[in-house]
Amino acid sequence: MLRRTRISEFIWKPYNHKLGIIMKPVVQLERTGCGIASVAAIVGLSYPKAQSIANSLGIFAQDEHLWSEISHVRKLLWHFGIKTGSREIPFRSWEALPDLALLSIKWHLEKGRTYWHWVVFVRENGHGYVLDSKKSLRSNRRTDLGRMKPKWYIQVTDTQLR
């Protein structure tokens, strides 16, 4: 049986938009670790800590299923007690997004399989931005929303970690 990680084991404070805690970007340390980094940003962990926990759950950045399936990211969020919407919602506009969501960008087909890059959308005080874990970016807190082309999103509905 999986044991959920307790809040006392965290290094940083978790995100809670009601308390005005600002989320910090987490840079992925592996070329394909955007899903792990996105969860780390939501939960408030460093990449190495989130990576270690993900690995203990059988989730590895090198696994191609992590790049093209949603279940691994949902499993990691569940482990931390984070609740999400039950389905992927097609992206319509930045204004229509909830205050906190996982977004799929750079969505593409490769050999008949879908792939994307995970990022986190945050709206604080009426202003939206994206936490993008890509290592080569000048800033991992992005406000150039028009340059991104989201395909769909998953709403994060409860960040009250247990």
Where do the PLM segments sit?
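Intrinsically disordered, low-complexity N-terminal regions enriched in serine/proline/glycine
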Residues: 14, 46, 128, 151-152
